[in-house]
Amino acid sequence: MDFSQFNRKASGYECLGPSVVAEAASYANSCNLSLWMSTRFKAPVDNDFLAKWELRHTAVLNHLKLNILDKFPHAEIDMELPLQTVNLCGNKLFGVADAVCKFPNGQLMVCDAKSGKKKLSHWIQVGLYGYMIQGVARSKGASVPEICGFALCYGNY
């Protein structure tokens, strides 16, 4: 592998995304070097792949939002919510939840849109988003929101 194509993340911004942690936790990717690299370096960008992914992901996001509005008309929905960084076993965890639904009783449901194949790691990833939301509330001394559920929406609708 040619590591010269990778750019070092800025000092203080070394972090892992929930998808990387989820793949390691589900043993979909159990390579320790991969975790180490993901924390410290950005992989080279493949613009063609990224453009195709953005189109598919946007379609699934729209489908997810329509489903949430249909099933939970009284819920407040935050789409593509950037979550604050939290500490997970000495690593910074940063991510963006595709949708967080807040119900009138204060409970939350965390949702993620997926444009690829179904994987066990997707459930772990959406669970980590819930952990992050609760962790930020704890660190601020605020009341910790109750997570009442998780949802995944796949592009094969």
Residue ranges of predicted features:
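Conserved beta3 VAIK motif of the Hanks protein kinase fold
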Residues: 111
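Metal-dependent nuclease catalytic cores that hydrolyze phosphodiester bonds in DNA/RNA
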Residues: 1-107, 117-119, 123-124, 134
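Hydrophobic residues embedded in beta-strands of well-ordered beta-sheets
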Residues: 107-108, 157
